[in-house]
């Protein structure tokens, strides 16, 4: 018996023991993976696992962390009740989580096992423990632990996950964060308070796509842009209307700035509608003649005078001839060519909103009849085409009567970076109506002849081409071998081309799910065109400034997610609507978003106008418009005004989903402070990026 005890004593003293290596914290931003007791081992957690199962779990977790660019493993070394312990310390008498697997010569130690796996993978290890007592001596606890284990630190879980020594908190991506991946991005914007992120391993395995989006927020390779340097001022001032202004309505919305800490009076009556920063707006009655409005705050007063002229007297009763512009009537059968970059084909020439089709510069059609209509206070001609729709005469130029009909024998395909270009063999640039029907491209060409055996050669996208001659037009239907995302009929040098765009797909590159996706962002207005005036007036951000700030925020977040982002402007410059629309065709993006902020006539109460809306023209843009409204309103708490059809110039492209976002109202005082707030700009920018991600089909 004595010999046995001596042997055991010798074994304990002399048997080689694993010594902890120097435990160093990882360089750069902390990116950790946490193993917790909240899940069974099969799901990536610690509970219900014996030594062999836990060893496998630790090896898998280390490999997973290494593969996903993480630099640390976090292990829950005790559950909340101390009923399960994952390390050995003489302060605790039992280790219920591992005791069943102990033997005389072997004591399984989960923390040591994890440290060994982490060391091989080049990962740091941190222990996580419940906050058992506010007076706990964490320095002593960590020092005692580091005598036996290669741990870089001890983190304590209370209301947050924080370092036991420095008390610096890290972002813990738990179930709530995985269900709202924007949370980590917004937390990372706190330059001083953000020290890294730790991801729940079980959640990573269960929700890999959300993990990818969450992790993208840790990409700091690009410099974060400066947005708006604006704080609502406390100076009493009126931004609208100007002193001495003439107003022709019975009401006027008076806007300006004030000190939010002091009461504001307008002609002795308290002004209730103010933003947190003191920006105010109030609807006032305007009587005929001179109206004086005096704003008072503390010992300061500001007055503006508004004049409302009396209505002009009645006329002589005679008729006034409406002038005619310089367009001309043409004979039926005259060919005409579209002269502008895009033009509307109208059901009714009296209304610009009755659009049947948008056609591009160079399209040729035949006039069936002419009719007069009004535009801009002048009479003008409208040409009714063979299709039955009308084009306004100033959008078209007459051609010689002997202009030949278009004629085509086939088409040849050439691959591009984004799809293919089909060049028609033959001559002519006929007017075409296009539509996507059940994944096929249906094109109706007017005044054009097609060979019965018309086919597309050399295409990897086009599966078949069917020609169906009809009454006045020929229908060409293209089916495809894979989904086509967009198309454009282009005319150049007397030839007709169809540009086909391949469908983008979500990438499986970790942290970069938008790799390969191209987005074109258009910050509305610019330079001499300020857009809507803000409620704070001159010297404060105008719409053009807020549009650019939100565009830059969205660009930054989209690029974090892997997208290739182009912007129409990156400074205070101006581009025409045509230049903006041309950029869509030239760039062939997968998504186009025009970023704007709203306004309204200032004869109504702008305090009642609030929220986000988004416009699309073609059906392909509807889903993107809906996603933008949903996500921006959720991120900013602005009201949802819906996705709506509209014929804005920049949205009239079939290249890709194209929308115009009105993110919020510039003339609503409270919402003005909201849309110019940097945290809200980042939240809305992230919402734009998430909307794009939602609309990209899975790979």
Regions found by a protein language model. Name each.
Residues 223-247:
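Short, compositionally biased P/S/T/A/G/V-rich stretches that sit at domain boundaries
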Residues 32-34, 72-76, 126-128, 152-156, ...:
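Structural recognition of the beta-strand scaffold that forms the well-ordered cores
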Residues 25-231:
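Glycan-processing catalytic domains of CAZymes
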Residues 85-96, 131, 500-583, 587-589, ...:
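Active-site histidine-acidic residue metal-binding/catalytic motifs
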Residues 38-42, 79-83, 131-134, 159-162, ...:
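Solvent-exposed loop/turn segments at secondary-structure junctions
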Residues 17-26:
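Sec-dependent signal peptide cleavage junction
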Residues 240, 247-249, 260-261, 272-297, ...:
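Short linear recognition/processing motifs and adjacent strand/loop elements at protein termini
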Residues 587, 594, 598-601, 613-616, ...:
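Active-site-adjacent mobile loop/cap segments within catalytic or ligand-binding domains
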